[in-house]
Amino acid sequence: MSITKEFDTIAAISTPLGEGAIGIVRISGTDALKIASKIYRGKDLSAIQSHTLNYGHIVDPDKNEILDEVMLGVMLAPKTFTREDVIEINTHGGIAVTNEILQLILRHGARMAEPGEFTKRAFLNGRVDLTQAEAVMDLIRAKTDKAMDIAVKQLDGSLKTLINNTRQEILNTLAQVEVNIDYPEYDDVEEMTTTLMREKTQEFQALMENLLRTARRGKILREGLSTAIIGRPNVGKSSLLNNLLREEKAIVTDIEGTTRDVIEEYVNIKGVPLKLVDTAGIRDTDDIVEKIGVERSKKALEEADLVLLVLNSSEPLTLQDRSLLELSKESNRIVLLNKTDLPQKIEVNELPENVIPISVLENENIDKIEERINDIFFDNAGMVEHDATYLSNARHISLIEKAVDSLKAVNEGLELGMPVDLLQVDMTRTWEILGEITGDAAPDELITQLFSQFCLGK
């Protein structure tokens, strides 16, 4: 998708393909009304007010055949998502009818939109910045209401405003430093300039570091916690997974080794998406299929954000249990004592502190797991502070980290007594890095790559 491409008129189906009550075909560009007028039978579109919905029919003018009865939305530039003229044809849902209407539009002068091209035009026409464009995709992909809240705030411009204000402050600082350098005849100008640079650099660094502190929570809410359920065979791992999911998604039997692979499912725990990984029981085995599952389990354990270690409280600790306790001790771990509905035989004093006794069979204390997750990852402070700006995008986090590094370089240079005019280079670099976040200084290749990840019609 070229950045310099002429803005011709584009079209795409904006609703998921398949049967449904309504399908929407979207057109955007200078010729949107002209093309729609060729195939729409109803009111004269050139005389219709903007932002209205109009009843009529879509007709193939070559055959004089009606394709569908529709409601046609007219939205005139610049007060549209793309800041171009936009037509949205609301058809009866279905693969055949929406495709027929799209093909008719393409035959009469529109081009098939590329993935994300409507949002890309909104960006290139100044309707949204890059953070807001990315928030559109985050909103589409949000798995929980908390992830949706963060995406909506970003779409509303919270991160954009913070970054733009910081960039303006950096420019103001650089301009003041430049003025001071240009008038060296004042005796105290060098000291004033150094003091200004130090104060502002520390202020910017503190702001960026505070933003980075939100990254862990934001990334968890956006992408979820990779959660490995581990334990020796037949301690209730798959039953726990099913209990959390409230569905029978994993095989549950009384035969050891029946979970021979890694089973992944998502579950919403108080607004946090947990990617639950039910692993094969980790033990020595000669079964080649089970052996592969065990190796994958060990890999899942290494990569997990959270480990749920399940032990059988109705049996004494085994060597395998002790091995798993040792293997997972450096992880964010919650130890669960399952089968509390049976007589207890495990020695609790041999276990780490803060274990949670549960009975998957009787659904006992499952809610305590949710509370412990909140304690570990959110310091019991709640999931989302509504007035906070969160970093959740890996690209944004990486760029903020680079900006902090540039600011640290300025501070280190000041401590070493380097000339302020040399340190302006690092301060300017910070300004440029922050511009990559909003798209003001992002390379064309990055913009093209970002929008290529969007779905068709968006």
Curated annotation (Swiss-Prot):
Q: Which GO terms describe its biological process?
A: tRNA methylation; tRNA wobble uridine modification
Q: Which InterPro entries match?
A: G_TrmE, GTP-bd, GTP-bd_TrmE_N, GTPase_MnmE, MnmE_dom2, MnmE_helical, P-loop_NTPase, Small_GTP-bd
Please tell me where (6S)-5-formyl-5,6,7,8-tetrahydrofolate binds in this chain: R26, E88, R127, K458
Q: Which residues bind K(+)?
A: N234, T253, I255, T258
Sorted UniProt keywords: Cytoplasm, GTP-binding, Hydrolase, Magnesium, Metal-binding, Nucleotide-binding, Potassium, tRNA processing
**CDD domains of this UniProt entry?**
trmE, TrmE_N
SUPFAM superfamilies in the record: P-loop containing nucleoside triphosphate hydrolases
Alphabetical GO CC annotations of the entry are:
cytosol
Instruction: Tell me where on the tree of life, at the top rank, the source sits.
Output: Bacteria
Which Gene3D superfamilies did the record assign? P-loop containing nucleotide triphosphate hydrolases, Probable tRNA modification gtpase trme, domain 1, tRNA modification GTPase MnmE domain 2
HAMAP family for this protein: GTPase_MnmE (MF_00379)
- Name this polypeptide is given: tRNA modification GTPase MnmE
Organism phylogeny: Bacteria, Bacillati, Bacillota, Bacilli, Lactobacillales
Q: Which gene encodes it?
A: mnmE
